[in-house]
Amino acid sequence: MNDNYLILSIESSCDETSLALFENNKLIAHKISSSASIQSLHGGVVPELASRYHEQNINHLFNEILNETKINPLTITHVAYTAMPGLPGCLHVGKVFAKQLAVLINAELVPINHLHAHVFSASINQNLTFPFLGLVVSGGESCIYLVNDYDEIKVLNQTHDDAIGECYDKIARVLGWKYPGGPIIDKNYQENLATLEFIKSQPAAKDFSFSGLKTAVINYIHNAKQKKISFDPVVVASSFQKFAINEIIKKIKYYLNLYKLNHLAIGGGVSANSLLRKKIQSLDVISYIPEMIYTGDNAAMIGAYAYALIKNHKKSILIK
């Protein structure tokens, strides 16, 4: 049996088109093209624009990888792609490209759960030890997992309303700041100015819920504007970030203690947040934190997770 794998991976779940090439677990090429600058003109992601962007760029990125690596595409053994979750039109572009390519080059098709790939995004350049607690915080999801193996991933807590990243984007937009909101709010964060209390903290065991926080912050801004009361946007943004990150940390501590775990892996776009990373690193556990380039949507995490599944004769769990 051939144990040498050449894996092309594809990510197209939202507004990033990304392709990567792995020789076994070694990343040898990685391309990301984002439509965020286009989306920012509309204040957020427009699904139709995002899927059209994927269609325009996916072949170009594939050709860039071929030119850069000089590989013969017929030597690719596996084509991994994000199967779910994501924007339907965007996922469709990646899926069609992956399927057509796999047929043309006679490669094995590997559908991947995007969220579980985020869980393992830190494994691109380090080994993870099972069992561990997994945290995925992004524009679409806020989830905590118990991870016993590559295909044994149990949801412990997840949001049933707005994801944390979505709240960042919407609050930034109401403040008049550009999309995406996460990096801008984080850049402007000042702990000594985080003085506002919008809502009360929730019990640690309760599912993630950021809708009430988002609504309270936006109402505060709207009320101030309507009454012509001046306010400092940095105070509002800092207060929001401090509360939101503290809620995440509180839940992490709860589940680490509940399951007697001392390993923690984080992923997703919000895992790039400097306050979250700082607080994670201060916990008395072994933490796996992805490099900044691997925090957002990217094909490297898809390929790394695909390799682990292939190598260990496992399949991605195609449910959240």
From Swiss-Prot:
Chain positions recorded as Fe cation binding sites: H114, H118, D297
Enzyme Commission code(s) on record: 2.3.1.234
Protein location: Cytoplasm
Record field: catalytic activity: L-threonylcarbamoyladenylate + adenosine(37) in tRNA = N(6)-L-threonylcarbamoyladenosine(37) in tRNA + AMP + H(+)
GO biological process, one term: tRNA threonylcarbamoyladenosine modification
Cofactor: binding details: Binds 1 Fe(2+) ion per subunit.
Name used for this protein in its record: tRNA N6-adenosine threonylcarbamoyltransferase
